[in-house]
A protein has these predicted regions:
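Short alpha-helical "recognition helix" segments of helix-turn-helix
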Residues: 26-35, 39
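Short, Lys/Arg-enriched anionic-surface-contact patches
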Residues: 1-10
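Non-catalytic terminal/accessory regions
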Residues: 130-159
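Helix-turn-helix/homeodomain-like alpha-helical modules used for DNA recognition
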Residues: 63-140
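Helix-turn-helix DNA-binding helix
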Residues: 39-40, 46
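Short alpha-helical "packing" element that flanks the helix-turn-helix/winged-helix DNA-binding module
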Residues: 11-19
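Residue-level signal for the short linker/turn that defines the boundary of a DNA-recognition helix
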Residues: 22-24
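Short Lys/Arg-enriched helix C-cap and helix-to-coil transition segments
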Residues: 50-66
Length: 159
């Protein structure tokens, strides 16, 4: 089951998208024509599902959590096996993605173009401006640019 098809219902996805733009539950409720309590209940369910998704990702990839931003769907983690920082993202356009932040051989990798396109789509969905010269950045650096704002609004785990 992937994030795209199985974790959030259509209504929950709609509420999650609005929450990124409108922090006030009452305003979200008015916009959707439902009660504030219904929005609150949905947000509790959304956060639970997203946290479970992140925890499953941590477990399946043997990662250690660092920070988690459930509003924007971004988690910072660490890979003890590869000794690398990792960004895990959830989005409508790309679903669940795991980005290992290493200085690799992106220019020689056959996935470089696909990674860059995915990151540029993420930037569009998240409203991140990417200048023309930045569009050609190595995917690792582009990932840091795309997710840097989301990682500032975070919950530090273990404190």
């Amino acid at each position: 089951m992937t994030f795209k098809s199985g974790y959030l219902t259509v209504r929950e996805t709609e509420i999650w998208n609005l929450r990124k733009l409108i922090p006030n539950q009452s305003e979200i409720a008015r916009k959707l024509g439902i009660s504030r309590q219904a929005v609150n209940f949905a947000l509790i369910s959304i956060e639970d599902k997203m946290e479970r998704t992140f925890n499953e990702t941590l477990d399946s990839n043997n990662l250690t959590p660092v920070t988690m931003n459930l509003v924007d769907g971004v988690m910072e983690a660490y890979s003890p096996a590869y000794q690398l920082p990792v960004i895990v993202s959830l989005s409508n356009i790309n679903g669940l993605k795991v980005w290992y932040l290493y200085e690799g051989n992106c220019l020689r990798c056959n996935l470089e173009r696909s990674c860059r396109r995915t990151l540029l789509d993420e930037a569009d969905e998240r409203g991140v401006d990417v200048a023309d010269d930045e569009r050609k950045m190595e995917p690792t650096k582009l990932a840091l640019k795309v997710y840097s704002d989301d990682l500032k609004e975070k919950t530090i785990l273990g404190s």
